[in-house]
């Protein structure tokens, strides 16, 4: 009987742990989506900025700086998209495990 109680208690603790992780993943996904939007806006800003640069402003240097900044922001967007996909997959796996645990009781 004591073994059954330990097993049940352990299952409950595992269920709570996975539920908390699932909620944390939801928050991280939302945070990543915000970062993606922010960096996409920065890319657009830099595109617009390059339209306003006038020829009298050492154009080659300014364009090189803008190109470097744009590349950096695009890489950040890509990194956040990849991280978001990984988090979504983990969240999906946890949802399936939680569903299986709750239906087996």
Curated annotation (Swiss-Prot):
One of its GO terms (cellular component) is cytosol. It is found in: Cytoplasm. InterPro entries: DUF496 (IPR007458), UPF0265 (IPR053375). Keywords: Coiled coil, Cytoplasm. The keyword Cytoplasm applies. Residues 15-42, 70-104 form a coiled coil. Belongs to the pole-localizer TmaR family. Pole-localizer protein involved in the regulation of several cellular processes. This is Pole-localizer protein TmaR. It comes from Aeromonas salmonicida (strain A449).
